[in-house]
């Protein structure tokens, strides 16, 4: 974190896949730590208490919408869905243009579990409409080759 704090937030850094801004680089490291930490919580069957920092991971999940499709050699369906999530303390977080046709709504934790490939979207309480139906099963907020979602296991929540 010390080295990153000395960089301009918009400075481009090389990484796997496209270059990233220093801010996105730091967010991606937070996402990786959270996602792999979730693997440990799941292994131990312990429920995690999330904080407002989850918003950074949700933001990364939203901003990688088009990249998710490009990474698979597909064209992203437009428009980009409106995403409205409830944070851990009940606050509303939203991205995009409000729409009743192309949207994702639900808990931020569910969304973050989906975009980090920890859970299939059908195993959450996320509501999807329009272009979000094609997106969420593929959604991937990390660099590298496409990774498939875990197989749906039926509603867990």
Where are these regions (language model features)?
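Structured surface interface patches that mediate subunit assembly and partner/cofactor docking
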Residues: 2-157
